[in-house]
Amino acid sequence: MLTNNNNHPFHMVDYSPWPLTGAIGAMILTSGMTKWFHTFNMNLLMIGMTVIVLTMIQWWRDVVREGTFQGLHTKLVSKGLRWGMILFIASEVLFFASFFWAFFNSSLAPTIELGMKWPPMGIQPFNPIQIPLLNTAILLASGVTITWAHHSIMECNHSQALQGLFFTVMLGFYFTLLQMYEYWEAPFTIADAVYGSTFFVATGFHGLHVIIGTTFLLTCLIRHMMNQFSSNHHFGFEAAAWYWHFVDVVWLFLYLSIYWWGS
């Protein structure tokens, strides 16, 4: 199989059950979420989440085996993976553009139902120089630490790369905890007019991306501890770093538009 895969200029994917189990898990997860919304029963939701997590772990394990131990990630394959990550991030940019469009469409010309003002009548927005500003500083600091880790890997400095990755993961966890606290103390809900809807959908999806990025970086941290990255073969880390910088930039736009200008 190794010889066959290296004798042609194509990225041949081995047979894998994980796309199927991932699709089944996603179906169960969305069905369970709908059930949870209506009946407050999380059983089906937790089953779907378990299937998704197990699929992720085993799918990533197979990709690591192919790229690190079998040598299947040739230069052409790596180029394809890079373009795939670039296109994925581009699709995420358009995804968040729709949220900003909804926010500015509502805020630049408030309707009479909103009291002809923004924020709408009765809405007490967050103070942008409190938790939101702290979260901004946390993500900016995490951008510095992930860059530190990247340069350390390219310079074959194992210990500093480990430190940079560890600090980035910790900052990601800290951001998520602060976001949860902010939601818990929020003086408005997702049902409070279009302001509440756009606020929680935009910041909530960004928070989900922070959790995904933190998981991605935690995986890279574990792989680095197992000496699976070299100075010229570490695209898994590069992809995680690109994704994390994207999350940073999106948060800056969220902070400036929703927290600062929108308040």
UniProtKB/Swiss-Prot annotation:
The chain crosses the membrane at residues 9-29, 40-60, 84-104, 129-149, 161-181, 198-218, 241-261. The keyword Transmembrane applies. Pfam families: COX3. One of its GO terms (molecular function) is cytochrome-c oxidase activity. Keywords: Membrane, Mitochondrion, Mitochondrion inner membrane, Translocase, Transmembrane, Transmembrane helix. It is a multi-pass membrane protein. Its EC number is 7.1.1.9. Component of the cytochrome c oxidase (complex IV, CIV), a multisubunit enzyme composed of a catalytic core of 3 subunits and several supernumerary subunits. The complex exists as a monomer or a dimer and forms supercomplexes (SCs) in the inner mitochondrial membrane with ubiquinol-cytochrome c oxidoreductase (cytochrome b-c1 complex, complex III, CIII). Belongs to the cytochrome c oxidase subunit 3 family. This is Cytochrome c oxidase subunit 3. It comes from Locusta migratoria.
